């Protein structure tokens, strides 16, 4: 490519003025339409000195009106201003969709496009009318141009956060992540997302971006995001969107990263268990049945099972502990409930009765006999109660089942 020479400091020649006037008189649908339409190549092109040979086509910051020769396609561009308005940039970007893909993939053409859109790229990513054109740019971009696009996004983490949390912006970001190939690109994206991960977790669209990182990149890289989530575990777990992202983190975490995240949840189990969203994080790790973890949660909640069993959200955690914990740990919960002075109230509670039924379902031997005996002692208070009679029915059903089994065993023995 011919190296370019600056002409912005001197008065333009008559030939240059003719070229400018010719460009001004040409109807344009967008800034890039001269690349789409057929123009006679400028026979006496002005060559413009660029910051470097590879960036020669980014010389759109000259103050006077300037004609620029694109050597790669033999067509010219015309620019009047040092900065482009958002609406103008939008019109330019929409015109990109009309370009043949082969022409769009030309390195110099791509440099021109990115050079003109760089100040508004983040805003354009959030415009529904520009999404198709931006995706076309991704498809046609080389590794070097994808790196440049990524840099445009991550240099301002406030703007990146805004894009990731936007309906259309989130989709475009996810597509960009799919085009990252080099380790430098991936690491740059991961650390950029890490910086804003707490806010993204608390957004539906932002959560999709984080989940996409988990799908595309290795645990060795995504652990940096999960570590940031662990540091802010309670804040994220108690958010409507955050509790879902936290479960995704638990699913993808490995080894020490998972250990740290679980430790944070367990240490805050008493707070999370009663929370409308936080309880889902506790339920999730209880169902994982990791040795020692459920026993630690049972210990953390000790002394409050009667209260928790009558709580709309916490009762689900108690049920899961009864179902997925070891027998000895479940027995501790059952004994605390039985010896509570509120046991009758628990049986009659809209949520507590399900906890008692789950206890009956998951205990055996002496613990079951003791629990069923205490329940039957309260028969006068339960048989007419809408929730109490459910528990009585459960006890009676299990008793009948055991009697049938005994009868079958006796019949086979004879």
Q: How does the language model describe each region?
A:
Residues 1-414:
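Eukaryotic gene-expression regulator signature that favors modular helical reader/repeat domains
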């Amino acid at each position: 490519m011919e190296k370019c020479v600056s002409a912005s400091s001197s008065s333009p020649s008559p030939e240059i003025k003719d070229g400018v006037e010719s460009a001004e008189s040409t109807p344009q649908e967008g800034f890039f339409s001269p690349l789409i339409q057929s123009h006679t190549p400028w026979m006496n092109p002005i060559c413009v000195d660029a910051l470097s040979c590879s960036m020669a086509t980014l010389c759109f910051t000259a103050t006077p009106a300037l004609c620029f020769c694109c050597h790669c396609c033999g067509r010219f561009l015309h620019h009047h201003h040092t900065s482009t308005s958002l609406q103008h940039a939008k019109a330019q970007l929409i015109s990109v969709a009309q370009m043949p893909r082969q022409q769009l993939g030309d390195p110099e053409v791509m440099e021109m496009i990115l050079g003109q859109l760089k100040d508004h790229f983040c805003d354009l990513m959030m415009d529904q009318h520009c999404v198709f054109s931006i995706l076309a740019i991704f498809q046609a971009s080389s590794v070097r141009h994808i790196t440049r696009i990524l840099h445009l996004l991550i240099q301002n983490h406030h703007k990146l956060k805004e894009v990731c949390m936007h309906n259309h912006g989130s989709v475009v970001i996810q597509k960009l992540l799919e085009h990252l190939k080099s380790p430098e690109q991936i690491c740059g994206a991961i650390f950029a997302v890490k910086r804003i991960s707490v806010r993204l977790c608390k957004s539906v669209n932002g959560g999709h971006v984080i989940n996409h990182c988990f799908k595309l990149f290795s645990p060795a890289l995504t652990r940096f995001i999960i570590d940031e989530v662990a540091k802010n575990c309670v804040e994220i777990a108690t958010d409507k969107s955050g509790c879902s992202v936290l479960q995704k983190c638990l699913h993808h975490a490995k080894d020490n990263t998972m250990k740290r995240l679980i430790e944070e949840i367990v240490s805050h189990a008493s707070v999370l268990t009663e929370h409308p969203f936080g309880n889902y994080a506790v339920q999730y790790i209880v169902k994982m049945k990791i040795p020692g973890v459920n026993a630690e949660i049972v210990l953390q909640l000790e002394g409050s099972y009667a209260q928790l069993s009558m709580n709309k959200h916490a009762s689900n955690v108690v049920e899961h502990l009864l179902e997925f914990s070891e027998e000895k740990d479940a027995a501790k919960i059952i004994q605390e409930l039985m010896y509570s002075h509120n046991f009758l109230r628990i049986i009659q509670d809209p949520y507590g009765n399900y906890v008692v039924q789950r206890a009956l379902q998951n205990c055996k031997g002496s613990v079951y006999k003791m629990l069923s005996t205490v329940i039957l002692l309260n028969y006068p208070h339960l048989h007419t109660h809408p929730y109490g009679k459910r528990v009585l029915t459960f006890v009676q059903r299990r008793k009948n089942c055991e009697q049938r089994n005994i009868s079958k065993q006796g019949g086979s023995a004879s």
